[in-house]
Amino acid sequence: MRLGRIAHPEGICFAIIDGPKDAPMQELVAKEIAGTPFTPPEPTGREWKLNEVRLLAPTLPTKVVALGRNYADHVAEVFKKSADSLPPTIFIKPSTAVIGPDAAIKIPDYATNVEFEGELAVVISKPSKNIKAENWQDHVLGYTICNDVSSRDLQFKDGQWARAKGIDTFCPLGPWIETDLDSLNLDDQKINAYLTHEGSREQKQDSNTDQMIVKMGG
């Protein structure tokens, strides 16, 4: 199931994004659900074509907990070191960084070297703490896409990552949450990013979750 959050002509709601997996966006339908995706979804009967609404961030996290330096190829590209010599590190993006998939990223004047990072994002289904590795999927609602926007100049200048990665709008999420946990091989998912402008489309990132140092559930 695909669960999203939309702005429609009468307000904002969560919705089931319905349609074939390979259908173009304009053929998908957003079916409003009562409440939030964190309870069994109950359709209200209202629906809109997806091109009649605006996709928002599919969830409203209190914070985004991230694992940096977790892709071997990315560590080599950005930090010029091997994954063995530079272990992963945890950092947090604030809720104010979260925006929808089509919202504008606003770069402040003091950030002069801003880069994208396409990421696999895990949406936690309930308050959780001290989870055993073998039970991790019991706490997952689904997966979405994150653009971990980063100001490299601030990141290396500050020595810590809060400012460089936590600027307002520096965490686009979406377009929706995919809840079909069994159909995804999380150890072999392509992570691609494209830059589009006036009809042109240029691939800017070509990675895969098989480059993860700490695997899902690890």
Question: What role is predicted for each listed range?
Answer:
Residues 20, 96, 125-129, 149-150, ...:
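Short loop segments at secondary-structure junctions
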Residues 5, 64-67, 120-124, 142-145, ...:
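Short hydrophobic-aromatic micro-motifs
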Residues 1-89, 184, 192:
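N-terminal non-catalytic cap/leader segment that marks the start of a structured domain
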Residues 102-136, 141, 145-154:
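Non-heme Fe(II) oxygenase catalytic core, chiefly the N-lobe of the double-stranded beta-helix
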